[in-house]
């Protein structure tokens, strides 16, 4: 089955396709002829943003679409950055700028209180029915400095206790088997 991926994020597309394998073929917005589509993520929840993206692309193409909205929720920050994860340090901020702001916000917070989770909501929108969502989470805590070279986003400061490593220190196949995105995609049931 083919699904139009409602994202221009190449890292996200590669990770999702690696997790899905041959089960589902993700078609990029460019390949679907709507690479110039712009979707404002203004929802208050991951679910609202994922649904908005999937439905917008489904309406533009007339084809089943899949979207992901994900982020980092840090308990000591009241769940922030949450839906603002990608722009925590401001619109257009780099991963390093976002990480720097996060580490500054947690300066002086003891390890036991640096608990966090990556959250991912996958939405699938079909032309003939209501969209469906699937949620996945990955628990961990925030380190005081970056570790590792793999992954993207906040992976270098997100520690996974089970492995004793940051997400960025894990090989891609291990990360993809435990990540929030993997947990959400594992729940995905496609209706043809």
Q: What are these regions, as identified by a protein language model?
A:
Residues 2-4, 10-29, 33-192:
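Anionic-ligand binding patches
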